[in-house]
């Protein structure tokens, strides 16, 4: 469960986020909607502890983003807007690197990477350098990195940006399947 509690953030005179509160329940897909500049990305950055709120807090599976930011962040898989992947690493190496950053052993990271490559249908490009990847291949690689540590919560910032209609549909199906797999494991 993700709980935003009166999150607020200012940048100088600009109030980017004003007292935002919501709950994103387990097993649900929750979206933040609003026009450009409404503070959606800023709100997400406060959730995944990249930005500290001026007021309020966020609880990620009970961990305070303010008082226990590392514990809160480890409960999240994050796909930030414009998620860059390392172009000189293969897709699999990108996943393994993030596994190491999340504290996975080499064996656990290898096993999880193999599982994600299958789940996300990345077999054709898993061993290729990411430099020439299509937008869809980059997205799958970034999504695999976000999922490598098997987080209970996934935060996506504009995941369909730059994708064609077919890729958007495929991503929606994939996210629904991921939710179904994760929710069936939890029960």
Sequence positions of predicted segments:
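Conserved ABC transporter NBD signature motif
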Residues: 56-67, 71-72
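Helical segment within the ABC ATPase nucleotide-binding domain
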Residues: 168-181
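Conserved ABC ATPase "signature" region
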Residues: 96, 100, 107-125
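Conserved catalytic motifs of ABC-family nucleotide-binding domains
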Residues: 150
């Amino acid at each position: 469960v993700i709980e935003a509690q009166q999150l607020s953030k200012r940048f100088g005179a600009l109030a980017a986020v004003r007292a935002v509160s919501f709950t994103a329940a387990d097993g649900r897909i929750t979206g933040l909607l609003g026009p450009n500049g409404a503070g959606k990305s800023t709100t997400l950055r406060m959730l995944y502890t990249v930005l500290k709120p001026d007021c309020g807090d966020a609880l990620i599976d009970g961990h305070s983003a303010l008082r226990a930011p590392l514990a809160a962040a480890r409960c999240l898989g994050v796909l930030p807007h414009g998620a860059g992947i390392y172009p000189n690493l293969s897709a699999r190496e990108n996943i393994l690197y993030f596994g190491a950053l999340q504290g996975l052993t080499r064996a656990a990271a290898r096993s999880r990477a193999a599982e994600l490559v299958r789940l996300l249908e990345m077999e054709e490009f898993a061993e290729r350098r990411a430099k020439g990847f299509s937008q869809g291949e980059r997205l799958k690689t970034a999504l695999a990195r976000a999922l490598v540590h098997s987080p209970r919560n996934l935060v996506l910032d504009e995941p369909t940006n730059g994708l064609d209609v077919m890729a958007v549909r495929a991503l929606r199906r994939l996210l629904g399947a991921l939710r179904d797999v994760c929710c069936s494991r939890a029960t």
